[in-house]
Curated annotation (Swiss-Prot):
The keyword Ribosomal protein applies. It comes from Prochlorococcus marinus (strain NATL2A). The keyword DNA damage does not apply. This is Large ribosomal subunit protein bL28. GO terms for molecular function: structural constituent of ribosome. InterPro entries: Ribosomal_bL28, Ribosomal_bL28/bL31-like_sf, Ribosomal_bL28_bact-type, Ribosomal_bL28_sf. Gene3D superfamilies: Ribosomal protein L28/L24 (2.30.170.40). It holds the Pfam family Ribosomal_L28. HAMAP family: Ribosomal_bL28 (MF_00373). Keywords: Ribonucleoprotein, Ribosomal protein. The lineage of its organism: Bacteria, Bacillati, Cyanobacteriota, Cyanophyceae, Synechococcales.
Length: 78
């Protein structure tokens, strides 16, 4: 399974690791992904989904159905 948030589409960021002597090497900054079982209120069922912690925070605030709708994601396909 790829390291991509199923709601927001967030993926790894290419960056540089800079040492004390200023030598740069490439590094991947991975998204903080968590596998979660979330309750979908509108359909009265559980959904297993891989989301970032930032998306989880927004889901707690808005709700899973409203947040997915605002992003244009169809939860029935997940």
């Amino acid at each position: 399974m790829s390291r991509v948030c199923q709601l927001t589409g967030t993926r790894a960021n290419n960056g540089m690791s800079v040492s004390h002597s200023h030598i740069r090497t490439k590094k991947l900054q991975q998204a903080n992904l968590q596998q979660r079982r979330l309750w979908w209120e509108e359909e009265n069922k559980w959904i297993n989904i891989r989301v970032t912690t930032r998306a989880l925070k927004t889901i707690q605030k808005k709700g899973l159905g409203k947040y997915a709708k605002s992003l244009g994601v169809d939860l029935n396909k997940l």
